[in-house]
A protein has these predicted regions:
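N-terminal export signals
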Residues: 5-25
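Polysaccharide-binding surfaces and accessory modules of carbohydrate-active proteins
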Residues: 30-268, 284, 696-701
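Short Pro-Gly-centered flexible turn/kink motifs
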Residues: 288-307, 716-722
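Glycine-rich, aromatic-flanked loop segments that form ligand/cofactor-binding clefts
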Residues: 83, 87-88, 94, 98-99, ...
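Active-site neighborhood of glycoside hydrolase catalytic domains
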Residues: 442-586, 612
Length: 723
């Protein structure tokens, strides 16, 4: 078959019938185009007859150049129902049906929360599906939160295969995109979180041709570890226009985004779009049976556009997270110093004998919270991971009782905390033996068993009532003020017990977990909950809109931490990002101060054998914590990250790393020399720069000719420079 005849007779050519061009002479006159403006952004819309098309999202006041991308298909919502004729012949989700034929009904604007909300309503005359698209703006930030709701107004069930949370259009020229677009995304993995890379679209599989691509650049996650492979955010930078679009998918389960192109005239693509959303049928087995009268809501997604590049996008998202995501909590601005006994310390084997000297050392260093990590509930001869679930103190670890040890924490002026993994029951636990399958995620008639753990199903109110009693007991009996909530397993597809599909069961469970957290914090508003998923395995802003602190990583090599924390600063607020400082018992002052520098521009997660390190190394820890409390932490809740050396690579042991933080009237840069040259040069104009910490190890700094040079006398050193 001739290729051109084949292309002309398939869905590519048919897209014009599904998605007519906005403003085409062939279409009857429709409603007038309109714009929705916030102080920082402009969304523009047009019509193809009575079908609404999203034209573009641009910074307020931005004038598109005459040769900028023109908008073609621009569907405002992409949705596909089972049995419908898909406009796309492949795996793309950029249009869908009835998404392409939705008829615009009306728009409504209202005051909402900290800003304004626009609601756009569509309907489909064939399926009787009604779709509501929500745009929620927040004062002072160039970001809008988007989500979609589908309502079945008909008499028959509808199968939802995908429903976009948001669509972005006109990101680039439909045919020249590979020369002007950079896609920024972050790979994420255990002990190597938040590794940012910039790709041309073709490097991710979205390749230019003279027509519409059948492929897409995409990323996603399947299961309850929302960040197991990638962070749920990305950016598209148009280097020709000097604009960057960005998004953050705010969901603690499966999600997906794609970037590709569509055509509205003939077969030549003229629009580069981004589809953004949560779980769907193709990628996460989340088919939804929408019954008559029922509704289905997508997950929320934050979107925005700025003039500039990656750093400007990070600044916008950082401001948005503070304005719209952080739950009010007294510790948000205090940035308390946390000691945790796990990393390079007791490693899940706590006892009264070991804890008492650690508690003394942590208090002497200046820590304000003291957290006993895993193992406090297991007998000395027990595998603590296979029996979790009862959350009762082990009598042989605490001969005078756990309360005796935690009372010592309080006597020394610290708040006690405990590690929990509340969402699971160990395979050999009493809880798993006693409770029915309805307490657990189930697939194909069997409980989901991962990493010696069964996964509790938070849709079951008996589960949440049980865990409420656990938390109540810990707070009332032990005065626990901090819960490290860990999660060391991924559910993958989810549960098909009492669900339309495994992915829908997981979505309902994910939302029930969030509701449980909200209820918990309403009862205990000063309780700090740390979000941990074997480190950064669930580092998303569904969880971080409820929890106060994010565990950055389980990485044990302190030399790799600067690359992880620098990348993570683009994804998590510095006042929520807890980074380890964990000197070994044999650490010298260089090693101890390197550890401290890594944590001092975010939240200090102190660990290590503070009871055994040398006096000189202990002095570096104590001095670092004192400087943090007296000088640095008051700036962190207003600081914006920047990257004088770009994004680092956790596998590169030669190249130095630098992370900056700017707050009103204050700028600091953390700089780490690894194995490379003794002088690190940064492109910063800072004639009055000085070393804040450590100030007694021979590190020098000089600002001259628009460059800042930091000289390290030895390899593997770090410092904080105030500029």
């Amino acid at each position: 078959m001739k290729r051109r005849i084949f292309l002309g007779s398939t869905g590519i050519a048919a897209m014009r019938a599904f998605v007519p061009v906005a403003g085409s002479d062939a279409e009857a006159a429709g409603p007038e185009p309109f714009e929705w403006k916030t102080p920082d952004l402009t969304f523009s819309f047009d019509f193809s007859a009575d079908k609404l098309r999203q034209k573009a999202l641009l910074p307020a006041g931005y004038t598109k150049p005459s040769d900028g991308p023109s908008v073609s298909s621009g569907v405002e919502t992409a949705i596909h129902c089972s049995g419908e004729d898909s406009p796309d012949p492949g795996m793309k989700q950029g249009i869908g049906q009835p998404g392409a034929r939705l008829i615009f009904v009306d728009k409504k604007e209202e005051t909402a929360g900290k800003g304004r909300r626009l609601t756009l309503t569509h309907s489909d005359p064939v399926t009787k599906l009604r779709v509501e698209s929500f745009y929620e703006a927040f004062d002072g930030v160039p970001v809008v939160r988007r989500w979609t709701r589908a309502i079945n107004d008909g008499a028959a069930n509808l199968g939802i295969e995908f429903l976009s949370s948001a669509m972005l259009h006109a990101l680039g020229d439909g045919q020249r995109f590979d020369h002007e677009l950079k896609i920024h995304l972050a790979a994420n993995s255990w002990m190597s979180e938040a590794q940012w890379h910039a790709f041309r679209p073709s490097e991710l599989g979205f390749v230019e041709n003279e027509r519409t691509s059948w492929s897409q650049a995409s990323a996603g996650s399947i299961g309850s570890w929302s960040t197991e492979k990638y962070l749920p955010m990305a950016m598209v930078e148009n280097t020709r226009l000097g604009l960057t679009w960005f998004w953050q998918i705010e969901h603690n389960g499966s999600w997906y985004w794609e970037i590709s192109n569509n055509a509205s005239v003939g077969q030549r693509a003229d629009d580069v779009y981004a589809w953004l959303g949560g779980p769907d049928d193709l990628h996460s087995a989340a088919w939804k049976n929408l019954e008559p009268g029922a509704s289905y809501r997508s997950v929320p997604v934050a979107v925005g556009c700025v003039a500039g590049g990656f750093t400007e996008g990070v600044a916008a998202l950082t401001a948005y997270r503070r304005a719209a995501c952080m739950r009010p909590h007294p510790d948000n601005r205090r940035c308390s110093v946390i000691f945790n006994d796990y990393m390079n310390c007791l490693s899940g084997n706590p006892t009264e004998e070991k804890e008492l000297p650690m508690i003394e050392a942590a208090a002497k260093a200046g820590c304000e919270y003291y957290v006993i990590d895993a193992g406090w509930y297991a007998t000395l001869r027990e595998d603590w991971s296979q029996t979790i679930g009862a959350w009762q103190p082990s009598p042989d670890r605490w001969p005078r009782g756990l309360a005796f040890v935690l009372d010592r924490v309080k006597q020394l002026g610290m708040v006690p905390g405990l590690w929990l993994e509340p969402e699971v029951a160990g395979a050999k636990s009493q809880l798993a033996q006693e409770q029915p399958d309805s307490w657990f995620l189930v697939r194909h008639g069997k409980r989901v068993l991962k990493n010696s753990r069964y996964l509790l199903d938070f849709r079951n109110p008996e589960v949440t009532r049980y865990l409420d009693r656990v938390i109540d007991r810990l707070v009332h009996d032990f005065a626990v003020g901090y819960v490290k909530m860990d999660y060391n397993v991924d559910s993958l597809q989810g549960t098909d017990l009492n669900a339309d599909s495994p992915g829908q069961g997981l979505l309902e469970h994910n939302r029930a977990l969030l509701a449980w957290l909200e209820g918990l914090l309403r009862r205990y508003p000063t309780l700090i909950i740390e979000n941990c998923g074997s480190g950064g395995g669930r580092m998303d802003y569904a969880m971080l809109s409820r929890t106060q602190v994010q565990s950055a990583t389980d990485q044990e090599d302190y030399l790799r931490l600067p690359a992880i924390i620098t990348g993570s600063s683009a994804a998590v607020l510095p006042e929520q990002m807890a980074c380890w400082s964990y000197p070994l018992a044999t650490s010298d002052p260089d090693q101890a101060s390197f550890n401290m520098v890594t944590a001092m521009l975010c939240r200090i997660h102190q660990s290590g054998r503070l009871d055994k390190i040398s006096g000189d190394a202990a002095a570096q820890v104590g001095n670092g914590i004192k400087l943090y409390k007296d000088v640095i932490r008051k700036h962190i809740p207003e600081a914006l990250p920047f990257y004088p050396m770009g994004m680092p690579d956790v596998t590169n042991h030669e190249r130095p790393v630098a992370l900056g933080m700017r707050a009103p009237g204050w700028t600091a840069v953390a700089v780490w020399r690894l194995e490379g040259s003794d002088t690190v040069e940064l492109p910063l104009n800072a004639a009055n720069a000085r070393i804040l910490y450590p100030d007694n190890l021979g590190i020098g700094v000089e600002g001259k000719d628009g460059k800042l040079a930091i000289r390290f006398p030895r390899s593997k050193m770090g410092c904080i420079v105030v500029v």
